[in-house]
Amino acid sequence: MVEKIIAIIEQLSKKYSVKPIIPDTASFSFILESPHIQELKHSAPVAGSSGKTMASVLLDQTVEKPLGLLVKENAEAGFPDRTLNRIGIMNVSNIPLQKKAYDLLDVKQNEFFFDLLEKIRTTNERTVYSIPEMNDLQTALLQKFNEHLMQIRGRTCTLVPCGRFAQKFVRLSTVTDDNWNIMYDVPHPSYNSWNQTRYRDKISELKRTFFENIIV
């Protein structure tokens, strides 16, 4: 079943995939759940409202563009910005986990697969499921995610999994490195959460670590 799920993911990836953007000089990499509509449009992780929240908080200024678009445009321009050069962005899954991002025909052709995606996306507290197919889907997603982490293995860097889904998969991953500093418990930046009072201490810690490692 794992092989069948991977085949579906690879087929959907031909039309709906958003790849990581990790400059060779990246020393601070953010890990999110998956792309959505704006990410597909711009072919960059965190290219929507969540990305705007990230950019405004991290750069300590109001910005018009989301972090994903800033990092992508900097890469396309030949890496002129020394700060953006050191930021990597990736998703656990290169394809969206929400079926709203897909054409209706593709959803109808893979209804069972999309039902599993929705269930695994909303049950972040679990690592083992009573439904065998959900365990198979988790294994398939983890295999793909491990490929992303292999790209930065051997680097000295800080990894920031944002939100419970990303944190769960970082913990499940067998790809590790003693040179990595992993900052857990950072919320997903959706719904302007990084500016909410209840996350103030964690976001202050994130900004402090970011400035110590990135701003040049």
Feature annotation, model-predicted:
Residues 150-155, 173-179:
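Short, conserved loop/helix-junction motifs that constitute active-site signature segments
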Residues 61-65, 173, 213:
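Solvent-exposed amphipathic alpha-helical surface segments
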Residues 154, 208, 212-216:
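Intrinsically disordered, charged low-complexity linkers and terminal tails
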Residues 1-157, 165-168, 191-194:
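A polyanion-binding, active-site-adjacent surface
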Residues 43-46, 103-105, 173-177, 199-201:
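Short, glycine/charged-enriched secondary-structure capping and boundary segments
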Residues 175-211:
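Short, flexible loop segments at boundaries between secondary-structure elements
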